[in-house]
């Protein structure tokens, strides 16, 4: 079954126009170690005839050197690009692959299954619309399978295909497939994943991957590729106009425009808009793009907006429709995936980056961390590498945002270490919190005094030192 178009040879321009208009689906493959994630991607590409001859020749040669399938072609090597990955037979980094069929364009994120690479998996899942959860038919649900399911739910992925892999090793048993299906549905009952589909496959042999397999006549569903091509994705989490200002454009004294990319919704000339967090109101005078003047701008377009009124608009501000305002607060509750080997501690200052807006912030309170093996809430005072927690975050100034469930782009932020400039964590906004009305006592102390106080309370709790931030 080939997805190559005859137009490539006869009319390349028409092919490119059709290709540009195809819907794009981003999906991630995840699961436990050695569940066959990379092999599945290799099989999808191979059976769809989307591998070049030189790539195939290279894989044949590498299969003999470092392959894990004996004399057979090791399709996982198509994705495992790092030398250390090939030598160990595992995935370490997030590997991205791009391909298309007659119906859709695809971006695949192949993520590592090992627990120590959970941060890599979270990074890969953050922009995906669908997840393929692989489960080894011999082993059933593993600890890391549960971990990945929880992260997919946390990151707002609404569509999941559960691929029960290595069915060839269990004699294509319907009973084993059904027991894994029942076990997964019990797990999914506590997660917010509305669309779940199941398919039994053998990535190694190609059963039910691109074409329906005669070896499992009891399975009445469709092969995996059919689901990928036809599953309906709701790309618009919200229709509300959100335009974060990236740059103020002043080429001369006669022109002042505000540049950025429309995150969601649409706006047209003459619309009344509000600038957040200031709340000032104005009207759109013109919309400019690389292609010239526009009457209307939609999500995904990079544009320049001019307004009728000379009001203060700066980088990091958010332009919205007058009555479709977002939250503005300096206090919020969020879920955090910690990605640094240095633990997250209370009251330590970090850079908090929301799209084009960067402020200083610190954890005001740990609500709890989630044991993602049991999904139970556990009390904590710090957060270690790969752990996930719900926290209360205090920012140095009010910031404009939506909840992550409403808008995955506006409701996401990253935490940056101020000393090393390394991304230390990723956050998803749950809701804003009311700012404390009482006087902020931290203004009475220097940053050094506050950090020293935090260290003393951490390492010498028997001194009963007062918390200067309260």
From Swiss-Prot:
Keywords, in A-Z order: ATP-binding, GTP-binding, Nucleotide-binding, Nucleotidyltransferase, Transferase
Catalytic activity entry: sulfate + ATP + H(+) = adenosine 5'-phosphosulfate + diphosphate
Region annotation (G4) ranges: 165-168
Region (G5) residue spans: 202-204
Region (G1): 31-38
Example GO BP: hydrogen sulfide biosynthetic process
InterPro entries: CysN_GTP-bd, CysN_II, CysN_NoDQ_III, EFTu-like_2, G_TR_CS, GTP-eEF1A_C, P-loop_NTPase, Small_GTP-bd
Pathway this chain belongs to: Sulfur metabolism; hydrogen sulfide biosynthesis; sulfite from sulfate: step 1/3
CDD domains (alphabetical): CysN_ATPS (cd04166), CysN_NodQ_II (cd03695), CysN_NoDQ_III (cd04095)
Region (G2): 89-93
Positions of region (G3): 110-113
Pfam families cross-referenced by the UniProt entry: GTP-eEF1A_C, GTP_EFTU, GTP_EFTU_D2
EC code: 2.7.7.4
One Gene Ontology MF term: sulfate adenylyltransferase (ATP) activity
Keyword flag Iron: no
Binding site residues for GTP: 31-38, 110-114, 165-168
SS bond list: none
PROSITE patterns given in the database record: G_TR_1, G_TR_2
Protein family: Belongs to the TRAFAC class translation factor GTPase superfamily. Classic translation factor GTPase family. CysN/NodQ subfamily.
Assembly with partners or alone: Heterodimer composed of CysD, the smaller subunit, and CysN.
Protein's recorded name: Sulfate adenylyltransferase subunit 1
Origin species: Francisella tularensis subsp. tularensis (strain SCHU S4 / Schu 4)
């Amino acid at each position: 079954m080939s997805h190559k178009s005859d137009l490539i040879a006869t009319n390349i321009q028409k092919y490119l126009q059709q290709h540009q208009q195809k819907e794009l689906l981003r999906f991630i493959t995840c699961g436990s170690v050695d569940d066959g994630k990379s092999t599945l991607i290799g099989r999808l590409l191979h059976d769809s005839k989307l591998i070049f001859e030189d790539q195939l020749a290279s894989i044949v040669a590498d299969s003999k050197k470092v392959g894990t399938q004996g004399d057979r072609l090791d399709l996982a090597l198509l994705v495992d690009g790092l030398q250390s990955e090939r030598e160990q037979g595992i995935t370490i980094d997030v590997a991205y692959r791009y391909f298309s069929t007659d119906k859709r364009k695809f971006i695949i994120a192949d993520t590592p299954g090992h627990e120590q690479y959970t941060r890599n998996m979270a990074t890969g899942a953050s922009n995906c619309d669908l997840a393929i959860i692989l489960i080894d038919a011999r082993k059933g649900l593993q600890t890391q399978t549960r971990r990945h399911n929880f992260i997919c739910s946390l990151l707002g992925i609404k569509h999941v295909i559960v691929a029960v892999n290595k069915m060839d090793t269990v004699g294509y048993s319907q009973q084993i497939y059904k027991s894994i299906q029942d076990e997964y549905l019990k797990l999914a009952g506590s997660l917010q994943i509305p669309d779940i589909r199941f398919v039994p496959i053998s990535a190694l042999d190609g059963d039910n991957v691109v074409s329906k397999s005669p070896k499992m006549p009891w399975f009445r569903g469709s092969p995996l590729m059919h689901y990928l091509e036809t599953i309906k994705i709701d790309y618009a989490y919200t229709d509300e106009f959100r335009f974060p200002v990236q740059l103020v454009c002043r080429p001369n004294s006669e022109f002042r425009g505000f540049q950025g990319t429309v995150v969601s919704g649409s706006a047209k000339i003459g619309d009344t808009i509000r600038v957040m967090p200031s709340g000032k109101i104005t009207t759109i005078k013109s919309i400019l793009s690389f292609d010239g003047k526009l009457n209307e701008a939609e999500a995904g377009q990079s544009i320049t907006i001019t307004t009728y009124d000379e009001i203060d608009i700066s980088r990091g501000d958010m332009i919205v429709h007058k009555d479709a305002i977002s939250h503005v607060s300096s206090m919020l509750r969020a879920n955090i995936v910690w990605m640094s080997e240095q633990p997250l501690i209370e009251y330590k200052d970090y850079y908090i980056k929301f799209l084009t807006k960067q402020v200083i912030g610190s954890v005001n309170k740990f609500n709890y961390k989630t044991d993602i093996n049991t999904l139970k809430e556990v009390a904590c005072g710090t957060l270690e590498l790969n752990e996930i927690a719900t926290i209360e975050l205090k920012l140095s100034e009010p910031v404009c945002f939506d909840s992550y469930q409403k808008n995955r782009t506006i409701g996401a932020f990253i935490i940056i270490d101020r000393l090393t400039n390394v991304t230390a964590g990723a956050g998803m906004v749950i809701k804003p919190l009311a700012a404390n009305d009482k006087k902020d006592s931290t203004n009475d102390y220097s940053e050094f005094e506050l950090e020293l106080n935090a260290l003393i309370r951490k390492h010498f709790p028997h001194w009963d030192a007062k918390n200067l931030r309260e």
